[in-house]
Every structure is written in structure tokens, then in C-alpha cells.
A protein has these predicted regions:
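Short alpha-helical
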Residues: 12, 70-71, 100
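Short amphipathic alpha-helical segments
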Residues: 18-20, 74-78, 119-120, 190-191
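Hydrophobic, well-ordered beta-alpha structural blocks that scaffold small-molecule cofactor pockets
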Residues: 1-56, 105
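Structural signal for interior beta-strand "rungs" in well-ordered beta-sheet cores
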Residues: 88-203
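Generic structural signal for conserved hydrophobic packing positions in ordered secondary structure
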Residues: 9, 62, 84, 132-133
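A generic structural signal for alpha->beta connector loops
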Residues: 25-28, 44, 59, 81, ...
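Short, low-complexity, intrinsically disordered N-terminal peptides in bacterial proteins
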Residues: 1-3, 176, 206
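Phosphate-bearing ligand-interacting subdomains
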Residues: 36-95
Length: 206
């Protein structure tokens, strides 16, 4: 039976999520978004209203298609008594051995999640990202396009691993970090902030 899905966020990321929903054989009911002057339809589905209108669609499942982790968290905590949809593209490889994916998470095309990995709620595992064995990703983490996490990595809540970044095995990254594009993390990161370069170092504020 097809699931009926309402997507929160009529944006580029929302288009991708809509495509994943359709590829999984489910149906997009429409989008909720607080932006002004939106068209009546987006990505082939209707704009249903503002986010606060979600209660009209309680028979559907919901997914937040917004890249910013703090905004995803705010919306997830605001919406009460909803069923969260987990979007996994059919081309993604998700191990069946002791692997868990939290509600509201998006797993995009050609992503790989290996055995023993634990993915939190409302995460984004972007196109072609690799999450190796026994990783732990806390809620609201975003692993960007082509990023690679070696085995037994722990990523704290709301941390963003940038496009093409790599994390060595057995590393821990604390919450609320941004790891820049192409950065290579070879040591534990214990202080929130932005980290760039090879090896990754904290970017000092000016």
C-alpha cells in the first residue's frame, strides 16, 4: 500500500526528496512551506499551505526537506503527534546486519550505509555518501554528497560533514560542527565550530 507523504520545504532539496518518495513507490501529497509568494504547485505537487497547517494532513506521513540542521530540529520539535516518513532511494545500499535508520531521515541515491551503523532521526545521507560499519550518527546530522566516514566514527548532533570530506576510522566529532568541503578529519574534534583543510583544523573567527 502506498504511503501518503507531505514534504516540509519547497526547495531544491525538497525536489530531491519528492523524487525519492516516488522512486520508493509512495505518493507525494504536497508541500508545506512558510515562504511567501510560492507557486500553486512545486515539483509536480501542490503547495498545501504553511507549516502550521500540518494538522490538516495528519492522515499522511511527514518528512522535513530542509538542509539546515537547526531549522530541521526546530520544526521536528514543533510538530506534535505526526508520523515521520523515512525516505530511502532504491539505489542506496543499506546493510541488513544490525543497521538502524531513525525516523524522518533521508538516504539519497547511491549512498552506502554499512553493517552496524546507527543513523539518528531527521538526518541526511546525501548522494553517494559512504557511512561505514559501526558508525553512530546522532539526530539532525548531514553527510554531504560524496563524503566518506570510515569505520566506527561517531558524529554528534546537528553536525554537517561537507561535500567530499573524509573522516578517518575511530574518530569522534562533537555536536554542532561544520566540516568543510574536502576536509580530512584525522583527530577527534571536541569543540563545536567550523573545520577546514587537510588535515582539518578549526577555522578561527575574525
Amino acid at each position: 500500500m502506498k504511503k501518503q507523504v507531505v514534504i516540509i520545504g519547497a526547495s531544491g532539496h525538497g525536489k530531491v526528496v519528492a523524487d525519492i518518495v516516488a522512486s520508493a513507490g509512495d505518493e507525494v501529497v504536497g508541500f508545506l512551506d512558510d515562504a511567501e509568494n510560492l507557486p500553486k504547485t512545486f515539483a509536480g505537487s501542490p503547495i498545501l499551505g504553511k507549516i502550521e497547517d500540518y494538522q490538516r494532513y495528519q492522515a499522511s506521513e511527514f518528512i522535513i526537506a530542509i538542509g539546515n540542521a537547526l531549522i530541521r530540529q526546530k520544526i521536528a520539535e514543533k510538530l506534535k503527534n505526526v508520523n515521520w516518513y523515512t525516505a530511502i532511494h532504491p539505489s542506496a545500499v543499506v546493510s541488513e546486519i544490525d543497521c538502524k535508520i531513525g525516523k524522518g531521515t533521508v538516504v539519497m541515491p547511491n549512498a552506502v550505509i554499512n553493517a552496524g551503523a546507527k543513523i539518528g532521526e531527521h538526518c541526511i545521507i546525501n548522494t553517494g555518501a559512504i557511512v561505514e560499519h559501526d558508525n553512530i550518527l546522532e539526530n539532525y546530522v548531514h553527510i554531504s554528497v560524496g563524503a566518506k566516514l570510515a569505520g566506527t566514527v561517531h558524529v554528534g548532533k546537528a553536525t554537517w560533514i561537507g561535500i567530499g570530506a573524509s573522516v578517518s576510522n575511530n574518530r569522534n566529532i562533537c555536536e554542532n560542527c561544520m566540516i568543510g568541503a574536502g576536509a580530512v578529519v584525522v583527530k577527534d574534534i571536541t569543540e563545536s565550530g567550523t573545520y577546514i583543510g587537510v588535515p582539518a583544523r578549526k577555522k578561527e573567527e575574525r
